[in-house]
Amino acid sequence: MTRTLMTMLVVASIAGCNSSGDSRSTSPSPASATPSIQIEKTDELIATLKSQKTINDQLMVIYERYEPLLDRSDSLTGPDTNQDGIRDDIEAFIDVLEVTEPVRKALKQDARSAQENISHDFSDKTESSVSKATEISKKFDRALACYEFVGVEVDDIINSSRLLMSLTYNTKKRTLAFLSYNRLLNGSTSVMLAPEATYCE
């Protein structure tokens, strides 16, 4: 899947975005802290998630039930209490999934990559900003390779990754920040990496 297609899918999937302020980060929190949002895994929820055919289907169940938990604050990055590079609400969605731990780690690696896209100022095209954007894009390539290594089907990789990006860029400000990052990658190429353990964080 090309970066252009991914960009179009993300922009198309984000509707009713709210305008937000300029803050790029929240106040620092202890790295040992737990995420500020947690979803209770009831027997009914577990059974419902286990009955889904794909990871993306599970994510959609969680989204439909817990959409109000999504952060829509003025902060570009939103709350990350344990400072692991993943917004607390998105981490809560991933933590409740009925998947193996290697798959959960791959999802978090993908979510962390998506979050990092908007953690830097890419409004100006400078040598350093292009270099940073390229570095982040390579992390996304590694996340895709990790998905495949842990056994996630290609269609599920595409759909789950697209949904995580949509959840991450869920305000107008966040979407515009992502587009600023993506603009710096115009004309660049991406090489599909082999599914190897070395690409998993």
Q: PLM ranges: what are they?
A:
Residues T2-M8:
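Sec-dependent signal peptide recognition
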Residues S13-G16:
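C-terminal motif of bacterial Sec signal peptides marking the signal peptidase cleavage site
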Residues N18-Q83, D89-E201:
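Calcium-binding acidic motifs and repeat modules
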